[in-house]
Amino acid sequence: MNPPTWLRGRLGVLLSLGPACAVETLPGVPGLLLAPVGLWLLFAAPVLLLRGFTDKVVSTRSGSLLLAAGLAVLLDILVALGVNTVLPLLGVERPLTRLVLASATTLVLLVLGILAPQSRRPLLRGAPLSGARPVAWAAAGALLLSVAGPIRLNNGLGGAVSTTALVVVTALIVLLLLRHARCSPMVLEAGIYAASATLLLLTSLRGWYITGHDIQREYLYFRLTLGGGFWDISAYTDPYNACLSITLLPVSIFRLTGIEDIYVFKAVLPLLFALTPVLVHRAVRNVASPLVALLSAVFFMAFPTFFTDMPFLGRQAIAFLLLACAMLVLTDSRRPLPLRRTVFTVLLAGVVLSHYSTIYVIVGTLATAFAVDKAWRLASRPGRARAHRAVGQGRTRTFLTWWTVAVPAVLALLWAGPLTHTGGQLESTLRVVASDLFGSGDARGGSSDTRYSLFGGAGVTPEERLAEYREDTIGYTRADRADGKYLPLDALAKYPTPVAEKENLPLTPAGRALDTVGLSVPALNGVLRQAAALLLQVLVLVGFVIALRGRKSPFTPVRDQITLTVGALAMMGLFTLVPQLSVDYSVLRAFQQGLLFFAPFIAAGALWAVRRAGRRAVPVLCVLVAGLLLDLTGAVPKALGGYPAQLALSNSGPAYDIYYPHAEDRRAAMWLNQRAAGDDLVVQTDRYSFSRLQTLFTVRTQDSVHPALLRSQSYVLLGSTPTRKDEVTVFFRGDLVTYRYPRDLLDTTRNLIYSNEGAVVYR
């Protein structure tokens, strides 16, 4: 008798593990073979073996696969952490090698294959694929352009291909909206993934080296772990080093797949994060119509932080992936509640290991939601019946309980405290927050990102922020300045540092045509961005109100979605009103995280707004979504001009100036590192040149060249942007400020000892 199909598939996975492990342990295996084998061991095989378990946690086929993918990522982290913890006790000094990781992964998968329940659901057979052909063509075109566009820009060519990719992504999303009733869920989710991956890759693939902000430091700690073959938090007690999503996980991927290390960060991690909008869709689809679920995923992708910041935040990307898996578990009420609560808590434990700030915000959100739920129940009148549809689809038993809140909180405190000793930033933030709340602080404003909030103020001007920065630097260098370690203030008075003018793209023919009729294109672009930010917030509130009323809501949220949305909005309000929180954790990133909870309310608000269009409601919605996407992704400003260039579309603009790595900078850094190796002088460079070059320096380095911080004796390296444009950017209290740099100060007080027509070094 032939075994059933599900057993044959499971047996095939188990039989593949031995040959895969053998390939990993053989020397000289070509990368074309090593990469698919490593990806199989790390992701594909765990997903297939975990399906039987995830089938018991969530009820849908795609939901089971998505949850298995999130658990596979968490499993990879835990396997690497396990060998890193246990093997040194047995005398193995370098446990993070390919041999050890491949053997441990294979052993864990064998145990998983034997002990885990077996899935009786076919993987793909019988899955409906209605509407697949047009979606497949649009998705393939978008993904192809997402790679071709950055390559052209990296080679010094124009951004037309990348702009076309944004147009194709928008067309793909409009196609999904128009055909959502005729497309199967699998086709919709494949289209969402293609759109998500395209938006992320257009940014993440920029530059031939590591490009971005936080990713530079993430890559540094990854390299330190990789070089030592061992993760040791005591060697570098830094919160970044405590994020296993950017240390152990990338090391496992690099070791087992042979993918070049920079592309682990530039491609593999973004492609994993691209699953998050799909998870948003699947989670919302458990409680809402296909249109509401699709819109929720679209609004999550359309928020600018998704495609401008998240490609440079590997640790937060993995944390968001696991949090989205947790929301999938929360909204699928067709499976046993105790099991779902346990898996939810395990996923949040994975967030603890992945990113410190994300789990702190989650704990605050959960605690607020739990309190709101208790207050809601106390305020409800027993036996009171509602005349219309009940919020929560009649299910009154809530998902959140005291231990689903307490366990992640305790784990976060343990991880940041006695286990890694990296909680100093949290303690510092809480002290400043307490000072702000009780009126003993310096009363300075928070990040200017709060100006996008409905409840935010006007923000701080660049001139005011730069003056604060200069005042701070003079204050904490006063004693050393008196000892002659820094240049005297009277000498600095001759060299002002005015704020640089904002550089916009030149007006295109279309932009000039608008300008001739009296319409200011720069003002129009600014108004559109501000209006988009306010629109999303208004839609959240509108959707929330109509969901509570129940009658006209396009979807009926479960009770926990309502309380979690209250918690997320409360955290947003706290970040807006308490300055230090907006400085230490971006308000825009907090909103992106909040979208995992309240995206369906935005969708409900949008559907309510177009309800009077009747049969034309979906086409009107398509126009609204297309306009929002084209504007926020930068396609409209690129077509009109009059707005700062975006990194994904141009070789200019503020992001390009401070994040893009140049070969000239690297050559200057390597030369200076050799020159200063035997010298006692510190190397000074600006913050963003240091960020791009920190993996090359082994000498003492200071990441500021502001005149008030220039030492009397030091090396000074000016990167490409300060050299070519005489501009330097600082990041202070949550804001980027670019000022004109007085190069004549260096020409007067120092000697030029190196120049390569892109970067210079003074002594």
Predicted feature residues:
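Membrane-interface alpha helices of multi-pass inner-membrane proteins
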Residues: 329, 341-359
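Hydrophobic/aromatic-rich transmembrane helices and adjacent perimembrane loops
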Residues: 39, 43, 161-168, 316, ...
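Membrane-embedded, hydrophobic transmembrane alpha-helices
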Residues: 1-185, 580
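Extracytoplasmic
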Residues: 427-498, 502, 520-522, 551-554, ...
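Transmembrane alpha-helix segments characteristic
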Residues: 13-21, 189-197, 536-541, 549-579, ...
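Membrane-interface transmembrane helices that cradle and orient dolichyl/undecaprenyl
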Residues: 323-340
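Active-site lumenal/periplasmic loops and adjacent helix-entry segments of GT-C-fold
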Residues: 38, 157, 176-190, 194-321, ...
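Membrane-interface helix-loop-helix junctions at transmembrane boundaries of multi-pass membrane enzymes
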Residues: 178-181, 337-338, 380-399, 511, ...
